[in-house]
Regions:
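Conserved cofactor-binding/catalytic machinery of classical short-chain dehydrogenase/reductase
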Residues: 6, 20, 50-56, 105
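Residue-level signal for the nucleotide or nucleotide-sugar donor/cofactor binding architecture
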Residues: 2, 101-104, 133, 165, ...
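Short, amphipathic alpha-helical "lid/cap" segments that border enzyme active or binding sites
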Residues: 83, 106-114, 176-187
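Mid/C-terminal beta-alpha module of Rossmann-like enzyme folds, strongest
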Residues: 110-162
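NAD(P)-cofactor binding segment of oxidoreductase domains
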Residues: 1-22
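NAD(P)-dependent short-chain dehydrogenase/reductase
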Residues: 46, 58-108
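Active-site "gating" loop of Rossmann-like NAD(P)-dependent oxidoreductase/epimerase domains
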Residues: 5, 24-47
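C-terminal amphipathic/interface module of NAD(P)-dependent oxidoreductases
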Residues: 149-188
Length: 188
């Protein structure tokens, strides 16, 4: 309930002020069976969390909802994100070649938020670079920039899922860098 209600409550509370809500949604609003997904694609995932995130998307002419997936360091050492998981691995792992991803690093997200405020971006925007990468290839980049190639990454096709996001909007000049650029910048 909180994911669905709170963003709209905050937006309503801010209605008469100059303050803008920047809300984060997720690619999890989609089932992953028919990607890529655009801003106007119907959120078809039926799990409670995913429905609550879809309901919470604020799409109006004052506030902004960025829909994406993020990777990056987590202040919680027990964090469950892909990057934290990868950094805890010691020997070899399986990388899913059929799990397709289109997210941004937390550093890129912060830069995009700053630029969105400057450009007064509103509505719903899929914050992606309009390219896809497999979780296997993403782990290859983590390995290259964070582990000096020490982890053996075995390709696995056991998971087939495409939650790729794409954007069609042309009113935001921020350019999301390539995945390699984002991961390299995160490592620097």
């Amino acid at each position: 309930m909180l994911n669905g209600y709170l963003p709209h409550f905050i937006a309503d509370t801010l209605r008469e002020s100059k303050t803008k809500l920047i809300h984060m949604s997720t690619d999890c609003v989609f089932a992953g069976n028919t990607g890529p997904y655009y801003e106007d694609s119907f959120p078809d995932r039926m799990i409670f969390y995913d429905r609550s995130k879809a309901i919470g998307e604020v799409n109006d002419d004052k506030n902004l909802t960025f829909r994406n997936s993020i990777i990056g360091p987590d202040i919680n050492e027990k964090g469950i994100g892909l990057f934290n998981w990868f950094m805890k691995q010691e020997d070899s792992i399986n990388g899913f070649t059929g799990a397709i991803w289109t997210g941004v690093t937390t550093l890129t997200l912060a830069k995009a938020m700053e630029e969105a405020v400057k450009q007064n971006l509103t509505g719903l925007y899929n914050l992606v670079n309009n390219e896809s990468i497999s979780k296997f290839d993403l782990c290859i980049l983590f390995n290259k920039y964070f582990r000096n190639g020490r982890i053996i990454i075995n390709p696995s096709d056991k998971l087939q899922l495409d939650k790729s996001l794409r954007h069609r909007r042309t009113d935001f000049s921020f350019v999301v860098p390539s995945y390699e650029q984002q991961i390299k910048e995160m490592a620097d």
